[in-house]
Every structure is written in C-alpha cells, then in structure tokens.
Amino acid sequence: MFSIQQPLLVFSDLDGTLLDSHSYDWQPTALWLSRLREANVPVILCSSKTSAEMLYLQKTLGLQGLPLIAENGAVIQLAEQWQDIDGFPRIISGISHGEISQVLNTLREKEHFKFTTFDDVDDATIAEWTGLSRSQAALTQLHEASVTLIWRDSDERMAQFTARLNELGLQFMQGARFWHVLDASAGKDQAANWIIATYQQLSGKRPTTLGLGDGPNDAPLLEVMDYAVIVKGLNREGVHLHDEDPTRVWRTQREGPEGWREGLDHFFSAR
C-alpha cells in the first residue's frame, strides 16, 4: 500500500500513454497532474523523444524544472536544482547521434538495408508523418544520442540489420510509431535507476516508484518500478513483464491518457 503523501516518483511514457497517439491530447490527465504537483510528487517524463521536444512538453504539462529521460534513456535531463551534479544539464550515454548516423549510412550503402531516418527528410515531412506542427517537428530532429527511422525492408532483413547493429554495440528498439537506434548500454531502466538513486542520495530515503507505459520499449522501465501501469495500446506485441503480480501491475481497459488516468485512479483513489 502506498499514497501520494509518501516519498514518491512517477515515471511516465508519452505517446500512447500520457498523450493520445494521434491527437497528442493530454487533458484526461490534467486533474492527476495537478494533484501530484500539489503533493510535490515529481512526474518524470520518459520517452524516445528528444530532450528539446520533452522540455517543450514539460512546460505545456506544468512539469518544468523536473528531470526527464529522453531518447529511450540515452539522454537524462537533470532537475534544475541539481546544478552541482557532474554533467549538468544533461547526461548523455554512449555513442553520439553523429556516430550512429555514420554507422547507419555505411550499412545502408554497403549492405543495402532499406530505411528512412529523420535526418533524411525535412521538418515538413516529419510534420506530415506525425501530425505535429512544423516547429514541433523540427524539435524531433535534435537528436543527441540516437537515430529515429522508418523501416522499409522485410522482417528477415530487419533481423539481419538488428544483428549487425548488435555487433557494433548498438540496439534497435521499436517505439509507438517509429524505430530507434541507440547505444546498447543505454535504456530507460538504467536512466530511471540513476534518477531514483539521485533522489535517494539527496533525501536520504528511497522513494516509492510508479511507472506508466504502453509499448514494448517501456517494459524495461516498468520492470524496475515498484508499481506499474500498462496502458492499453496499439502495438500488437503489447507489454509483457516478468512479474505481473496484480498487486504491483495494473493493465488498463482504456487507451492513452484515459488509461493513464485509470491507472492513477486504481492505485491512489481508494487509498
């Protein structure tokens, strides 16, 4: 049993979880975001998005100044009050965006894999793909430690591509809409554990953690949470955890931000 009155951290995915996958609406979560803010509970956004995108969303959601996890854990944006921590304002794990881009270009040229990266197109094209405004689409191209792409080849070729990336110290990760290439050592779980440890070091007590996500790339994050909400999503593979004890894990009936609200209602409304 836990409540929002105790030391607590909430980690949340964005697209398909806190945000609607198509409209990007977040209004169903507004009441809970307000309650958590009033209780001084940090809501830590955790996504494949760039830090530039997420800083913009933090302001929209009233979460500015809090830490966030960008690019599937390859980038950690530190909290504003953590200016004494080495690496402030951002910690970047492993291989840089530029280095990954070079690897992908070589694989495409020499082994003829078919894919289109966000670096291959302009912001107008990304806006068309995503439904974002052009100014917001431009933020999606400001990668620091990963590459986002659309796969345009067969499943067999994807397996070969994944194996080649693994040999080179990279991983290939499926998101809600796109695929992502990043350093094999990076992950939402490692980033979350670092943030949890930092809060524990600063407060002297380990906070209870709640995570929310809807896609396969959220599973590592949810595995390291004390409690988890698996938001009903569009991905055919779904989310599967090693420990799905119903006292720890709640699968929502609703999708997107409605499911996010349902998960918070489940764990807190009766407490």
Curated annotation (Swiss-Prot):
InterPro entries: HAD-like_sf, HAD-SF-IIB-MPGP, HAD-SF_hydro_IIB, HAD_sf, MPG_Pase
Disulfide bond annotation, renumbered to this chain: none
One CC-aspect GO term: cytosol
A UniProt-annotated Pfam family: Hydrolase_3
Residues holding Mg(2+): D13, D15, D214
E.C. number: 3.1.3.70
Cofactor field: Mg(2+)
Keyword ATP-binding: no
UniProt-listed GO biological process terms: mannosylglycerate biosynthetic process
PANTHER family: HAD SUPERFAMILY HYDROLASE-LIKE, TYPE 3, PHOSPHOSERINE PHOSPHATASE
Annotated protein name in UniProt: Mannosyl-3-phosphoglycerate phosphatase
Species of the source: Shigella sonnei (strain Ss046)
